[in-house]
Regions:
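Acetyl-CoA-dependent GNAT
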Residues: 3-8, 12-18, 22-105, 116-118, ...
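Short amphipathic helical patch at the helix-1/turn junction of helix-turn-helix
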Residues: 102, 136-137
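Flexible nucleotide-binding loop
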Residues: 109
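Residues forming the Rossmann-fold NAD(P)(H) cofactor-binding site
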Residues: 113
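Conserved GNAT acetyl-CoA-binding A-motif
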Residues: 116, 123-135
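Short glycine/proline-centered loop/turn elements that form peptide/ligand docking sites
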Residues: 116, 138-142, 158-162
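Conserved catalytic-core motifs of GNAT/GCN5-like acyltransferases
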Residues: 134-135, 147-162
Length: 162
């Protein structure tokens, strides 16, 4: 367990935690993103949080996958992939902030800000030049969160789930 603030820890996700992660994402994703999808986000959650996909993501080299713990309760997940390059950027050392999902009851409490600040400090310490991520521009709250922190728009992409 990594303590990044007195009330916030990162707990590594293990293969034995898959069911817990899946349940957590059913609590988090549909309330925030259901209006994007005809099926209220079921396809996305079932696809991205299938046992098979989680095992692939847990085994990926240079990836770290955590539960976010706030006040001793698991309230989200956070995943980074070191040395993951964004097409079109020339900087050698890049890290992808792949996932940061927090339960709606803990939003606007500084948890996301604290986690992103911790990642930025880790990147600086490891001499990384770029942190990048994919954010849905239709999810205005998340998009503005990163924009306020100085992240810049790079390119528009479309999710392909075929």
């Amino acid at each position: 367990m990594i303590t990044i603030h007195k009330k916030i820890q990162l707990q590594p996700i293990l293969p034995t935690d898959i069911t817990h992660l899946q349940k957590l994402m059913w609590d988090i994703y549909p309330p925030a993103y259901s209006y994007f999808w005809e099926d209220d986000g079921a396809f996305y959650v079932n696809n991205q949080y299938s046992k098979e996909n989680i095992l692939i993501e847990l085994s990926q080299e240079n990836a770290q996958y955590y539960f976010v713990v706030f006040n001793n309760e698991i309230i989200g997940n956070f995943r980074v992939v070191w040395n993951e390059k964004l097409t079109g950027l020339l900087q050698e050392k890049q890290v992808k902030l792949h996932r940061l999902y927090l339960h709606p009851k803990t939003q606007n409490k500084g948890v996301g800000k604290t986690i992103v600040s911790w990642l930025e400090a880790q990147a600086i310490f490891k001499n990384y030049e770029v942190i990048w991520l994919d954010a849905m521009d239709k999810q205005e709250q998340a998009f503005q969160f990163y924009k306020k922190r100085g992240y810049k728009y790079h390119a528009h992409i479309f999710l392909d789930f075929d």
